[in-house]
Amino acid sequence: MHRLTSDVDFFARSAVQVAADLIGADFTVSGVGGTIVETEAYLPDDAASHSFAGTTARNRAMFGPPAHAYIYLSYGLHWCLNFVCLPGSAVLIRAIEPRWGIDTMRARRGVREERLLCSGPGRVGQALAISRELDGLPLGEDPFRLTLPSTKPPLAAGIRVGITKAVEQPWRFGLAGSSFVSRKF
């Protein structure tokens, strides 16, 4: 594995490619996190994407430079974490297998079972203390730490979940066989 620094080349590609390549990466926020086991890609011409209708105050980070965080509030309840790729595209972090700061995650989430700590984008946000203040920050700097896998793990792929538009796109990726994904493939 290697630490991602300020080099944006990894993210300056199609979000579909980046979403697949993030599986198996280690990610932490202020030392709390784990291995990314599920992602979804969103593109600017994708009716399910926040960027589909253009730039707004809410999605401005999606149109900023690659390798930055895009944070949004889902259903007025959960902060969701995305990694910005090319302009108007991002990767939603849907699930993480907890590895570091598990007791902190348990306290934040109010649950004991490790599988339930980060299995879903809202749970990821709560467990990692994702907030609007992180929106637009570079992924190569504190409080973030992202280490990409040195070898490609076995992938599962399927249609995205929890959306009502462009549901046919097979842009959801996961670590094959992981029990930490939000939904089975």
Curated annotation (Swiss-Prot):
Q: Which GO terms describe its molecular function?
A: alkylbase DNA N-glycosylase activity; DNA binding
UniProt xrefs under HAMAP family: 3MGH (MF_00527)
DNA damage as a keyword?
yes
Gene3D superfamilies assigned = Methylpurine-DNA glycosylase (MPG)
* Family, similarity comment: Belongs to the DNA glycosylase MPG family.
Q: What is its EC number?
A: 3.2.2.-
Please name the top-level EC class of this enzyme. Answer: hydrolase
Report the protein name in the record.
Answer: Putative 3-methyladenine DNA glycosylase
Species of origin: Rhizobium meliloti (strain 1021)
Which of UniProt's keywords are assigned here?
DNA damage, DNA repair, Hydrolase, Plasmid
The record's InterPro entries line, in alphabetical order, gives: Formyl_transferase-like_C_sf (IPR011034), MPG (IPR003180), MPG_sf (IPR036995)
Q: Name one GO biological process term.
A: base-excision repair
